[in-house]
């Protein structure tokens, strides 16, 4: 049986430096995720760090995205091999790894997603990702179809951006603007010049190593500025933010 994920089109688009517009998914239910999958975004982040997601909520959301053109990207709660292995086995191929500060941490993330000898991923012969053992070439294809995006959101990460970006197997560098702002002493103010300078520096260094860069930017002016700076995969909003904003506007329309 064929696996419709191979080849990984999102990974190929990033490698070709094609702009990929995405959205954050934090509501953690299959219906809202299915709606996002019909909206036309290139990629969607299913958040396992700050949203109430786990294996039991991720599986129905992956099912809801079956047939969608939007590539599911999972943000893992932490850079931990067992967590990553379980998410691989349920069918994720694109990973966003938070709070990467060193080359060694980037290498660990890559190794966690690769079968030996390239990595340390544990082997199960029957799971959702290989359609329960029916994808004949799964083991041959898996390693080269995994996307690893590492998130820089600390001063140490900024300092080590060259080493991180140069890490083999890292497909892109993603900026966490809120945590980066906090780390630089500007909690709640990602628009501060110090933070913006750091963001542009990260983009530039990623590009110097031939790696695409991305960011979450729910404000249109910010998103367009980052695209102008060379970011190629930008999440321009979140389901939670859109839902809150739209419902508040609707209520205000009739109550004010």
Swiss-Prot record:
Substrate binds at residues 151, 178-179. It catalyses: 5-dehydro-4-deoxy-D-glucarate = 2-hydroxy-3-oxopropanoate + pyruvate; 2-dehydro-3-deoxy-D-glucarate = 2-hydroxy-3-oxopropanoate + pyruvate. GO terms for molecular function: 2-dehydro-3-deoxyglucarate aldolase activity; magnesium ion binding. It comes from the Bacteria. Keywords: Lyase, Magnesium, Metal-binding. Binds 1 Mg(2+) ion per subunit. The record marks 75 as: Transition state stabilizer. The keyword Transport does not apply. It is an enzyme of class 4 (lyase). GO terms for biological process: D-glucarate catabolic process; galactarate catabolic process. Gene3D superfamilies: Phosphoenolpyruvate-binding domains. Its EC number is 4.1.2.20. Catalyzes the reversible retro-aldol cleavage of both 5-keto-4-deoxy-D-glucarate and 2-keto-3-deoxy-D-glucarate to pyruvate and tartronic semialdehyde. Homohexamer; trimer of dimers. Belongs to the HpcH/HpaI aldolase family. KDGluc aldolase subfamily. NCBIfam families: GarL, PRK10558.1. This is 5-keto-4-deoxy-D-glucarate aldolase. It comes from Shigella dysenteriae serotype 1 (strain Sd197). The gene is garL.
